[in-house]
């Protein structure tokens, strides 16, 4: 009996060490050498301080900043561990809202967002990504149209010409990956950091 179990146990231990230890360590080391910024989380620094990651969205509020997509992520309610509460861009709990197209709560939330955005920029069509969440709830990017939609609000709040802000958005647009994958996009964190630099000049 032992002679039949021994090869299985040896193979199980060997594969565990190989795939659970050696392979992950090798890939982590290789990634750190070939792609040091990406392997460290694509962190963004300003004045020597980490202010975010290019890969995870942040909740920007107020009229002076570009806003990202809505986020449906949640966190445990500190007053009742059996409940959750909204926590936009919570990377520890990535996920969508599970609200389907027939959900009254989703329809009400989108309607309220559309009305708020129409009041902000009357006459302009509201870009869909400003009222819909991504599957992960962590999307760091918006469409160029969504960024341009917000220009009048930011120009008024920061006392900057709209043309300068449109040029800023155009400079931050990233094309399709490899020219084929995805859509043109703007990283909201990078755009807001560039906005702060522009406003500081």
UniProtKB/Swiss-Prot annotation:
Keyword tags? ATP-binding, Cell inner membrane, Cell membrane, Ion transport, Membrane, Nucleotide-binding, Potassium, Potassium transport, Transmembrane, Transmembrane helix, Transport
**Membrane-related topology note:** Single-pass membrane protein
UniProt cross-references to Pfam families, sorted A to Z? KdpC
InterPro entries found in the cross-reference section: KdpC
Keyword Ribosomal protein part of the UniProt annotation:
no
- Give compartment(s): Cell inner membrane
Primary subcellular site in the record, as a coarse category: membrane
Listed GO molecular functions? ATP binding; P-type potassium transmembrane transporter activity
Q: Keyword Membrane, does the record have it?
A: yes
Which superkingdom heads the taxonomic lineage of this protein's source?
Bacteria
Annotated Gene Ontology cellular component terms: plasma membrane
Q: Which residues cross the membrane?
A: 17-37
Sequence similarity: Belongs to the KdpC family.
Q: How does it assemble?
A: The system is composed of three essential subunits: KdpA, KdpB and KdpC.
Q: Which HAMAP family match?
A: KdpC
What is this protein for, i.e. what is its function?
A: Part of the high-affinity ATP-driven potassium transport (or Kdp) system, which catalyzes the hydrolysis of ATP coupled with the electrogenic transport of potassium into the cytoplasm. This subunit acts as a catalytic chaperone that increases the ATP-binding affinity of the ATP-hydrolyzing subunit KdpB by the formation of a transient KdpB/KdpC/ATP ternary complex.
The protein in question is named Potassium-transporting ATPase KdpC subunit
Mind giving the lineage of the organism this protein is from?
Answer: Bacteria, Pseudomonadati, Pseudomonadota, Alphaproteobacteria, Hyphomicrobiales
């Amino acid at each position: 009996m032992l002679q039949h179990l021994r090869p299985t146990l040896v193979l199980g231990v060997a594969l565990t060490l190989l795939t659970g230890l050696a392979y992950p360590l090798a890939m982590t080391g290789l990634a750190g050498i070939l792609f040091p910024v990406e392997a460290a989380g694509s962190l963004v620094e300003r004045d020597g301080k980490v202010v975010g990651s290019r890969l995870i969205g942040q909740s920007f509020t107020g009229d002076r900043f570009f806003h990202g997509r809505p986020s449906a992520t949640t966190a445990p309610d500190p007053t009742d561990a059996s409940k959750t509460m909204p926590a936009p861009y919570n990377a520890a709990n990535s996920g969508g809202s599970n609200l389907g197209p027939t959900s009254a709560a989703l329809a009400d939330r989108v309607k309220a967002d559309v009305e708020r955005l129409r009041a902000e920029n009357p006459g302009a069509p509201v870009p869909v990504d400003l009222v819909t969440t991504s599957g992960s709830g962590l999307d760091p990017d918006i469409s160029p149209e969504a960024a341009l939609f917000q220009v009048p609000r930011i120009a008024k709040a920061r006392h900057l010409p709209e043309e300068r802000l449109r040029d800023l958005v155009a400079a931050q647009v990233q094309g399709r990956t490899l020219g084929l994958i995805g859509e043109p996009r703007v990283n909201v964190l990078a755009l807001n950091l560039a906005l702060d630099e522009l406003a500081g000049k």
